[in-house]
Amino acid sequence: MKRSVMASLFLGACLFSAGAYSASADDKAVDFIRRADEVRSPNKPFRYTLTIHEFKTGATQPDNKQVLDISMRFMKPEGEMKADARSLARFIYPPRDKGKVLLSDWYDLWFYTPELRRPVPVSRQQRLIGQISNGDVIVTNFEYAYDATLKGEEPCGETQCYKLELVRKSAEVTWPKVDYYVEKEGDNRPYKAAYFSLDNKLIKEVLYQDFQMVLGKMRPMKIVVKEARHGKSYSVMTYSDVRYESLPESAFTRESIQRGAK
């Protein structure tokens, strides 16, 4: 009887210890993605130019090009400031695309062109150019969109990374699962993200590169996107002219883009 009680106490202690470790690891995972989110996007409204180049297999020069002028209201609650996740992507190049606009309001995405009477809903997975989908040009808040689990450490080039498994919190989130690699040291800068389908097939990989001091923090100014099913073809997103901006909330509405986004 005494041995049985001791065994039960030992088993209970082990389960408690494992549970405490799991909770601690999950808390760390949330902290890591929060810090990486802060690297990818400041917690203030900002604006930037996004240039996308598509490279075919074996090509040294881009086959296609798209330029967007993007305004972001992507903020987490802080003091009296409420959470927000809206963006406005204006098409600049090629010239035939001028006047087209993508409006993102949390998980809703709308497309407008002067030929249409009103904005129409579109999918974030819909292809925009090359390996880039509509959702790729808009910053994703991983902390809000995914539950995170710390899976361990792996080498990332010349540094060491934490590997995080992200599982979406709702069906509204575009990708069901993401393997997310963030640097172990410093600000937990994002290194790579691998996106998976519902049946756990790799769809694409995203590499964060060319970190520069922008808006008070080292941020990736280049993102390389590779799709698993397109061989060695890839697309490159380059960020420039990044600055703070204070567009009114009213600018991020379907009515506003019909009148002409500024």
Protein language model features and the residues they cover:
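Extended lipid/amphipathic-ligand handling interfaces
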Residues: 36-37, 69-78, 208-213
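Bacterial N-terminal signal peptides
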Residues: 8-17
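N-terminal, post-signal-peptide region of Sec/Tat-exported proteins
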Residues: 48-82
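Functional cores of ribonucleases/endoribonucleases
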Residues: 70-103
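Flexible, processing/modification-adjacent segments and terminal tails
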Residues: 23-45, 52, 60-64, 95-176, ...
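Bacterial N-terminal signal peptides that target proteins for export
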Residues: 1-9
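Gly/Pro-enriched, hydrophobic low-complexity segments
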Residues: 108, 118-122, 137, 159-254
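Edge/loop elements at the starts and ends of beta-strands within beta-rich repeat scaffolds
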Residues: 37-46, 80-82, 213-217
